[in-house]
């Protein structure tokens, strides 16, 4: 009996030792950041390197020396500028002859870089090379993938580079961006739970209004128009037309009443209730999933917004999806689910899809 008990004890010890060994063998240190905050009239960066939290105080004097260490390539003044940046709710742009749009990258940073380089938006050093063209990012940087921070900082930096070249980067908000800022972690990658543990900061607070990226994201719109093309993450429902919600008001309501906020069940604002719900611009899928949706309804929406085309993400397909002779175009081609993806291209009045090989197909 004693021999049997001793044998079982030895087996148990060996099993535990094996489990510990396997955990050590498969343990992978994480790297993330920086998360830059405005604290007591100065900037403070938090970085995680090999699962060790490091903190840096940033000033105009030391920034040239530490920017490489904190993995930033933007200018010091760019970090500070977000705190004086005012939201542009109108978001109307005219006379643009080159546009590239993509959506729903969800932290798949390498695939995002591959498709931007293949289609002439960035060079091999990841810098802007699209001249006076406009890049539209249609939302959902957050969730699923494990390189959300890298994606956001690249968009942040690219935005500044584009401005200097006479171009423009438009970062629109998606439902997962709003979820992340609101503290909804249902789709968050496990890596960021470890980030929370190491920083001792809730993930949504890493993007609070006192952080550079959080403040920057809170200045971003939900809808924009470029010439006769309307861009929005999910879509525009007929309910928004019936409520007569123009682009400017939608962006203003999201900025002031919805983004990063939990909508109370007893909310009395019917506009906020509509915009934050399934028929709002971040969540709507009716173009592709509502069997009653028709071209006539699409025309009513386009007429109200004085547009001829609506470009959306959110609903995933294998390729760019076209409805009603290019009146509605869905451009979420699965990058967020690790597919190669596609981009939407507008060049001098002609629409194309662009692949990761750089091939263009006329839509």
Features from the language model and the residues they span:
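Bacterial Sec-dependent N-terminal signal peptides
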Residues: 1-23
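Feature recognizes metal-dependent phosphohydrolase scaffolds
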Residues: 18-363
């Amino acid at each position: 009996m004693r021999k049997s008990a001793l044998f079982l004890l030895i087996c148990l010890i060996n099993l535990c030792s094996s489990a510990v060994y396997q955990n050590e063998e498969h343990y992978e240190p994480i790297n993330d950041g920086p998360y830059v905050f405005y604290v007591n009239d100065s900037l403070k960066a938090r970085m995680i390197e090999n699962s060790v939290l490091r903190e840096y105080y940033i000033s105009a004097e030391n920034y040239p020396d530490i920017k490489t260490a904190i993995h930033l390539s933007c200018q010091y003044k760019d970090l500070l500028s977000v705190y004086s940046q005012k939201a542009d709710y109108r978001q109307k742009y005219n006379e643009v002859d080159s546009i590239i749009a993509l959506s729903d990258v969800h932290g798949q940073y390498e695939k995002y870089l591959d498709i931007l380089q293949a289609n002439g938006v960035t060079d091999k050093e990841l810098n802007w090379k699209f001249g006076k063209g406009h890049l539209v990012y249609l939302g959902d940087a957050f969730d699923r993938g494990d390189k959300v921070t890298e994606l956001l900082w690249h968009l942040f930096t690219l935005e500044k580079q584009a401005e200097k070249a006479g171009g423009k980067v438009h970062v629109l908000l998606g439902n997962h961006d709003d979820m992340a800022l609101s503290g909804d972690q249902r789709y968050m990658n496990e890596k960021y739970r470890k980030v929370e543990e190491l920083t001792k900061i809730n993930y949504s607070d890493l993007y609070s209004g006192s952080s550079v990226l959080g403040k920057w994201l809170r200045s971003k719109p939900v809808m924009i128009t470029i010439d006769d093309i309307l861009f929005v993450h999910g879509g525009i429902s007929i309910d928004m037309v019936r409520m007569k919600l123009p682009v400017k008001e939608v962006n203003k309501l999201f900025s002031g009443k919805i983004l990063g906020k939990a909508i109370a069940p007893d909310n009395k604002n019917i506009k906020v209730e509509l915009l934050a719900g399934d028929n709002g611009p971040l969540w709507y899928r009716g173009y592709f999933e509502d069997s009653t949706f028709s071209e006539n309804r699409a025309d009513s929406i386009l007429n109200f917004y004085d547009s001829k085309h609506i470009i959306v993400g959110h609903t995933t397909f294998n390729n760019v999806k076209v409805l009603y002779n290019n009146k509605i175009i869905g451009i979420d081609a699965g990058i967020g689910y690790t597919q190669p993806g596609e981009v939407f291209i507008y060049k001098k009045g002609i629409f194309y899809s662009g692949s990761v090989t750089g091939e263009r197909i006329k839509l």
